[in-house]
A protein has these predicted regions:
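Active-site loop/oxyanion-hole signature of alpha/beta-hydrolase fold enzymes
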Residues: 33-36, 75, 80-122, 126, ...
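Flexible "cap/lid" loop of the alpha/beta hydrolase fold
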Residues: 132-136, 142-174
Length: 288
């Protein structure tokens, strides 16, 4: 549990997670994370039991997970999702501060704001890596972890490593070129994803996020961290990424591996029905 000396939990906030309301509520929450002021765009639903924290990937927003309310497996369960700093509707006073460690601290501060002790977590791509680092730092708080193509090895940096492979004169030019390359990718839903990037991400955060993702993937011992977690885990990947070298290793070490058909890196765009079915099945039987 976060120390009360570090995080101040408003008494009125903790009650939000115990209401009987079943709809998602949108709100803004002001936080100070590592000296940077945030106005975090949050969607949440109260309920009974430990909440599910949803962390979106780079270039996406909290709305990737809004359909959770349509899934009966989550009826009555508290839900928390938000736009990461530099993404969506969240406002961040210092975009240059944003990195994976910064995103981990953002998650910890928001959990403290809602007085959350333990929780389930679902993270995609950048959000999966954020969730992994959070779970590694506080393993007793994480009840289960669904990692949707979040980084666990150097080979996972096919997007983020472009910050080194395709240098540009400035952040805006790199981002424009990145969008064009992504639009032309042969992976499912890449053009759809690329078309909204300008609206969902500030160019100024790209370098900090991508550089930290590459650094952690190359030198952060991520596979050991993931396999060492004591909670039930699932790794979800798209059919086009069947060639990931570590899938059998995950299975041999007790991680449930789930494959989404007709999908690359973005199951929430390519095959959301199957993605939600797999997520729901895991929450019903997490230890199988």
């Amino acid at each position: 549990m976060p120390s009360p000396n570090v995080y101040t939990v408003p008494q009125s906030t903790s009650a939000l997670m115990m209401s009987s309301n079943t709809e998602l509520t949108k709100t803004s929450i002001e936080l100070d994370v590592l000296g940077a002021r945030l106005k975090l765009a949050v969607m949440y639903r109260p309920g009974e039991g430990a909440p599910v924290l949803f962390l979106h990937g780079f270039g996406s927003t909290k709305e990737d997970y809004a359909d959770v309310v349509l899934n009966q497996a989550f009826d009555g369960r508290p839900i928390i999702a938000y736009d990461a700093p530099g993404c969506g509707e969240t406002e961040c006073a210092d975009l240059n501060a944003v990195s994976i460690p910064f995103l981990v601290e953002t998650a910890r501060h928001l959990l403290a704001h809602f007085a959350v002790v333990d929780f389930h977590v679902v993270g995609h791509s950048m959000g999966g890596l954020t969730a992994l680092m959070l779970a590694d730092a506080e393993p007793t708080r994480v009840l289960s972890f669904i990692n949707i193509e979040g980084n666990v090895a150097p080979e996972d940096c096919f997007l983020s490593r472009q910050i080194a492979d395709f240098p540009a004169e400035n952040a805006e030019l790199f981002f424009e070129n990145f969008i064009e390359r992504t639009w032309r990718s042969r992976y499912h839903s890449s053009a759809l994803y690329a078309a909204s990037l300008r609206h969902k991400v500030r160019a100024a955060v790209v370098r900090g996020i991508f550089t930290s993702m590459v650094e952690l993937s190359d030198h952060g011992d991520l596979m050991r961290r993931f396999l060492s977690l004591p909670c039930p885990r699932m790794f979800m990947h798209g059919e086009q990424n069947d060639g990931l070298s570590y899938l059998s290793n995950l299975q041999e070490n007790g991680v449930r591996v789930a494959r989404v058909r007709s999908c690359g890196h973005f199951p929430m765009y390519s095959n959301p029905v199957e993605m939600w079915s797999l997520i729901a099945d895991f929450f019903r039987f997490p230890d199988e």
